[in-house]
Regions:
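Kelch-like beta-propeller repeat domains
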Residues: 1-117
C-alpha cells in the first residue's frame, strides 16, 4: 500500500491540503482516507508499527509548523501528538528502534542540523 498524504493545493504556497489517499497496487486503485487534522505540505511522513506519522511542514500561506499527528488505518482516523520543539519544513523522518526521529529541515531562517526523537 502507498499513501499520498497532504500537499500543496497550488503553486503559490497559499493553499495546504489535508487529504489522504491510499493506493493499492494489486487492485490498481485509489481510495480516499480520513484527512489530517492539520493541512500541510513539505512535511515529514513515516510508518511505524502499522501507523503513519506526519510532522512539521508548512500550512496555509507558508506558515512553518511544529505540529505532529498519527494516523491509525484500523480506525481511519488521525490523532494529534505533542508539538515538536522547533517549527520545521523540509524535514526527514525515520523510524528506528520503535521511535520516530525528525531530522534536519528549515525553520524559516536557517537550515537545521537537529535530530529529535
Amino acid at each position: 500500500m502507498i499513501y499520498l498524504v497532504g500537499g500543496m493545493g497550488d503553486m503559490s504556497g497559499d493553499e495546504a491540503i489535508s487529504s489522504v489517499e491510499l493506493y493499492d497496487p494489486q487492485a490498481a486503485s485509489w481510495t480516499q482516507r480520513a484527512g489530517m487534522t492539520v493541512a500541510r505540505y513539505e512535511h515529514g511522513c513515516v510508518a511505524l508499527d502499522g501507523k503513519l506519522y506526519a510532522m512539521g511542514g508548512e500550512g496555509a500561506g507558508g506558515q512553518k509548523l511544529d505540529t505532529a499527528e498519527v494516523y491509525d488505518p484500523q480506525t481511519d482516523g488521525w490523532q494529534p501528538l505533542a508539538k515538536m520543539t522547533t517549527k520545521r519544513t523540509g524535514l526527514g523522518l525515520a523510524a528506528v528502534g520503535g521511535k520516530v526521529y525528525a531530522i534536519g529541515g528549515f525553520d524559516g531562517g536557517s537550515s537545521l542540523d537537529l535530530v529529535k526523537a
